[in-house]
Amino acid sequence: MNDALLRALSTVNDPELHRDLVSLGMIERAELSGDVAQVKVNLTTPACPLKGQIELDVRSALLQVPGVRDVQIEFGAMVRAATQPALPGVKHVVLVGSGKGGVGKSSVAVNLAASLARDGARVGLLDADVYGPSVAHMLGQGQARVTANEDRKMRPIEAHGVRFISMANLSPAGQALVWRGPMLHSAIQQFLKDSAWGELDYLIVDLPPGTGDVQLSLTQTVQVTGAVIVTTPQDVALIDAARAIDMFRKASVPVLGVVENMSYFVAPDTGLTYDIFGRGGSRKLGEQYPLLGEIPLDVEVRKDADAGAPAILAHPESVAAQALRAVARTLAGQISVRTLSELPEQLPVL
């Protein structure tokens, strides 16, 4: 490490954490080769939404060092685990919930997982909606079956870079499950602890609607980084979303933010915007919790889900896909802020 370069880098703050890159441990390499400064910066998440700003700030700071005429920046990523990791090898467990059904929660969960994976993170997706599993179908793996490895642990199925477990891949198609609370609790325990998830940066959990046994089992079984609430602008959905938020508060699960799905509709023939389910309701919740994003109502998102391809991959240029990508990156940033804010302050490099 070159001391002069480190001193310059210690003046560059992470825009979200408001601490310098050196004290945060984000500088892996800082060397001077002739008049070229060569540095490697490990971002807090592969989905860092402020990578461009960090690159500009690093370049500007290093060009102020005497003798430096050019800067070469390599970016890596190192997702830091929560203070108390949730499961062996799993850095963060993120719950995706809603107060009621029909708000597009599973679609959001699938696209969040696929987006994080596309950005380079190691992602798992647990379909905890035991009575109405839909993740497997949305990932194009409705006919696949879960198998066991040599340690007799369930081997997650992989699709679009995401490892997932769903009851749809364990029970016969069309068969209804009539389980009481203890059986649900046992199933959730198995999904979490008897599955060979491997090393994951994020395990996204698609919860069933409401505030029932599955939610309680999850919050009692593993250390959860936080929850994302999916709602629509409709008043009745917002009322139920508030109940879900209250449940997580009582279970001491941090609410990372709110996603307003089906926020508006843009007519493809006229370009006019229609607020089919109302407008701005989630911003009231956002006064207490971050509004992670507003996803427009888009028929292609539904078609892509039916076809087994996340919208962010099938139609990445669409407004809905871009909004979902932005939500995933904002969520990753929220997790990084929460995790790194727990680090002790370090003295700056002198």
From Swiss-Prot:
InterPro entries found in the cross-reference section: FSCA_dom_sf, MIP18-like, Mrp-like_CS, Mrp/NBP35_ATP-bd, NUBPL-like, P-loop_NTPase, YlxH/NBP35
GO terms classed as biological process: iron-sulfur cluster assembly
Any one Pfam family match given in the protein's UniProt record, by short name: ParA
Residues noted as binding ATP in the record, renumbered to the chain: 99-106
Transmembrane segments annotated in the record for this chain: none
GO molecular function terms listed in the Swiss-Prot or TrEMBL record: 4 iron, 4 sulfur cluster binding; ATP binding; ATP hydrolysis activity; ATP-dependent FeS chaperone activity; metal ion binding
Protein's UniProt keywords contain Glycosyltransferase: no
Keyword Nucleotide-binding assigned: yes
Keywords: ATP-binding, Hydrolase, Iron, Iron-sulfur, Metal-binding, Nucleotide-binding
SUPFAM superfamilies reported for this sequence: Fe-S cluster assembly (FSCA) domain-like (SSF117916), P-loop containing nucleoside triphosphate hydrolases (SSF52540)
Function: Binds and transfers iron-sulfur (Fe-S) clusters to target apoproteins. Can hydrolyze ATP.
Subunit-level organization: Homodimer.
Assigned protein family: In the N-terminal section; belongs to the MIP18 family. In the C-terminal section; belongs to the Mrp/NBP35 ATP-binding proteins family.
Protein name: Iron-sulfur cluster carrier protein
Gene name for this UniProt entry: mrp
